Curated annotation (Swiss-Prot):
Required co-factors: FAD
Organism per entry: Nitratidesulfovibrio vulgaris (strain ATCC 29579 / DSM 644 / CCUG 34227 / NCIMB 8303 / VKM B-1760 / Hildenborough) (Desulfovibrio vulgaris)
GO BP, one annotated term: tRNA methylation
tRNA processing keyword on record: yes
Function: Catalyzes the folate-dependent formation of 5-methyl-uridine at position 54 (M-5-U54) in all tRNAs.
EC number(s) reported in the record: 2.1.1.74
Binding site for FAD: 15-20
Keywords from the UniProt entry: Cytoplasm, FAD, Flavoprotein, Methyltransferase, NAD, NADP, Transferase, tRNA processing
Protein name according to UniProt: Methylenetetrahydrofolate--tRNA-(uracil-5-)-methyltransferase TrmFO
Region (Disordered): 453-474
Family per record: Belongs to the MnmG family. TrmFO subfamily.
InterPro entries: FAD/NAD-bd_sf, MnmG-rel, MnmG_N, TrmFO
Length: 474
């Protein structure tokens, strides 16, 4: 532990997104005077439009809320640690089956209100375009939480310190007006008719001819060209639908358009493909086209997506778009405490570190705030073990690999179970093991949970036969 970091009294945080807000609150509540810089509304990135803090730009879904999934497990850990993002998400959630989706405007408003009400935080709405900005000079620590859309000036300044930067594309799915959906074709329901999810999703069934026509149109559609200085590096979890389609004609049917578990009520048979629509808000006045992130030109989006059965008259509330995401090669440029190896006074948090996703970004900012708050108390906070969702995510940022890529929370980041178990038992076992390790870590690290820790019951694997665990599911 460095002596200078035991006397933190002031902090400057660049970026009031999910990670920045999480970190700011942790530090302010530990007695640190925090200046939180947010460039909106004076300047907006290509993907942002809401002046509120904590804006969600890619989707209104925070993905699965089931603790038998990597991201669901991470959410539970964050709830127990008192995450403001999870507080806001739970307060503004909209029906989405097993997923945690939110009303994005109410969500951002909730976070903004909490930040503005915190006496230890001064919110400055202006852009910080360089690490040499005079406003940063007096801060004991500087946190860059500018997100994947960090401004060009700040990105260049950071690149000068770390010796370079990496980037990839993130694509946004179109949103359509609910009243423009043809409900004589589109039907509501969940995969396998799971209870509690009825009506959370709308489903557009496709027969083989309809799918083939859509597929050919998608491949032929005109795309927004990349800028000369940008090389396309897609993250698998948010790949443009047209890029996915280029892998082969059946890729979509086995991926986002898989029809398994659905029956078309018009025919009584399983469709060849299913395209799902997910509610954007509580009133269900708008739906996003699930899995259809795209970089097609706007006119082409309208032409191609209106070929989907039931969407012939679709009114586009927001077109899909593509923006550049910026992140560092974390294992090379970051120390274990998320400080820059080249400048221990500067820390990174959120997606710019190489975590991927809303929840993961928030978790990263929350963790950094916890680490620095502990140092103020004169102690080092031990990292959760890699068997936990948070620990596994942090381990990803520390593990050198030849081609570092962003990752979301998934069981594949964790140590293998080392057991021969049936496939359906793997996720519950990963989850149960994670809960045991996390609760033990809370006690050993002296961290008091905000809510009672949840301990699931692991499946009985006595005498279980099945394939050995080789690759964990997310």
């Amino acid at each position: 532990m460095e002596d200078s970091l035991t006397t933190i009294t002031t902090a400057a945080i660049i970026g009031a997104g999910l990670a920045g807000c999480e970190c700011a609150l942790r530090l302010a509540r530990a007695g640190v005077r925090v200046t939180l810089f947010e460039m909106k509304p004076a300047a907006f990135s290509p993907a942002h439009s809401n002046p509120d803090l904590g804006e969600l730009v890619c989707s209104n879904s925070l993905r699965s809320d089931d603790i038998a999934s990597g991201v669901g497990l991470l959410k539970q850990e964050m709830r127990e640690l008192g995450s403001i993002v999870m507080e806001a998400a739970d307060a503004t959630r909209v029906p989405a089956g097993k997923a945690l989706a939110v009303d994005r405007d109410l969500f951002a408003r909730h976070i903004t209100a909490v930040i503005e009400a915190e006496p230890g935080i001064t919110l400055e709405r202006r852009e910080v375009a360089s690490l040499d900005d005079p406003a940063l000079a007096s801060a004991d620590v500087v946190v860059i939480a500018a997100g994947p859309l960090a401004s060009a000036g700040l990105s260049d300044s950071l690149a000068a310190v770390v010796g370079g930067q990496l980037y990839f594309y993130d694509a946004i799915a179109p949103i359509i007006a609910a009243e423009s959906i043809d409900l004589s074709i589109v039907f509501s329901g969940s995969r396998y008719g799971e209870p509690g999810e009825e009506g959370d999703y709308l489903n557009c069934p496709m027969n083989r001819d309809e799918y083939d026509a859509f597929y050919e149109a998608l491949l032929a559609a005109e795309k927004v060209p990349s800028r000369d200085f940008e090389k396309e590096l897609h993250f698998e979890g948010c790949m443009p639908i047209e890029a996915l389609a280029e892998r082969g004609p059946r890729t979509l049917v086995f991926g986002p358009f898989k029809p398994v578990g659905f029956t078309d009520p018009r025919t009584g048979t399983r469709p060849y493909a299913i395209i799902q629509l997910r509610a954007e808000n509580r009133n269900k006045t708008a739906f996003n086209i699930v899995g259809c992130q795209t970089k097609l030109k706007y006119a082409e989006q309208e032409r191609v997506f209106r070929m989907i059965p039931g969407l012939a008259g679709a009114e586009f509330v927001r077109h899909g778009s593509v923006h550049r995401n910026t992140y560092v090669n974390a294992p090379r440029v970051l120390a274990d405490d998320l400080s820059l190896r080249a400048d221990k006074r500067v820390f990174l948090a959120g997606q710019i570190t190489g975590v991927e996703g809303y929840v993961e970004s928030a978790a990263c900012g929350m963790w950094l705030g916890m680490v620095l708050a502990a140092r103020i108390q004169g102690r080092e906070l031990p990292t959760p073990p890699p068997q936990t969702a948070l620990g596994a995510l942090l381990m990803h940022l520390r593990t050198p690999v030849k081609n570092f890529q962003p990752s979301n929370a998934n069981f594949g980041l964790m140590p293998e179970l080392g057991l021969k178990v049936k496939k359906r038992e793997r996720k519950p076992l990963y989850s149960a093991r994670a809960r045991e390790h996390f609760v033990r870590w809370l006690a050993e690290a002296g961290v008091t949970p905000v809510i009672e820790p949840l301990l699931p019951t692991a499946p009985d694997t006595t005498g279980a036969a099945g394939e050995e665990t080789t690759q964990a599911e997310s």
